[in-house]
Amino acid sequence: MKKWTIEDSQELYNISGWGTSYFGINESGDVYVTPCKDNTQVDLRDVMDELALRDVTPPVLLRFPDILDNRIEKTSSCFEKARKEYDFKAENFIIYPIKVNQMQPVVEEIISHGRKFNLGLEAGSKPELHAVIAVQCQSDSLIICNGYKDQSYIELALLAQKMGKRIFIVV
């Protein structure tokens, strides 16, 4: 029987397919996460062992808000770099499609950290538009209405505009 290697773990977990620079395999063959800018590695096996000691059993959802923050910063800096390189004068807005992840803690983190980066939200359905209006606190942040628009969807978008929201209806 062949001895298990770190490369075997990388292949098994397909780290190169999804891990970017945030996830990897450590010398023990365990998956680790590097959620913070200081490059601290957190061994996920250690996290699960600690949770087991506290009588928390899988499945467990782990969130890494620092990764969300870093992705917003990287996206903004890439667009800003291109804007300067090509002498593009218009302002850049990052738009997060709410359908990607509607979990309240995720959306709140994205909105909170995204404020300084002109981050707006995109809603492709009436339920998504309700959610976006409810969480979008800054009135100057963009709300992009994209998707099927029946009369009630358009009325809701116009009502949000009357409430001071910056609404753009894509036709």
Region spans (language model):
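A short linear-motif detector with a strong N-terminal bias
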Residues: 1-4, 10-12, 39-41, 73-75, ...
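A general structural signal for short secondary-structure junctions and capping/turn motifs
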Residues: 12-15, 21-24, 50-52, 86, ...
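Low-complexity, highly charged intrinsically disordered N-terminal segments
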Residues: 25-39, 45-102
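Generic serine detector
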Residues: 9, 16, 21, 28, ...
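Residue-level signal for well-ordered alpha-helical segments
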Residues: 2, 8-10, 44-45, 49-52, ...
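N-terminal basic/disordered segments at the start of proteins
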Residues: 1-40
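Residue-level detector of functional hotspots within protein domains
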Residues: 8-11, 17, 80, 84-86, ...
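Active-site-proximal beta-alpha core segment in soluble small-molecule metabolic enzymes
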Residues: 87-171
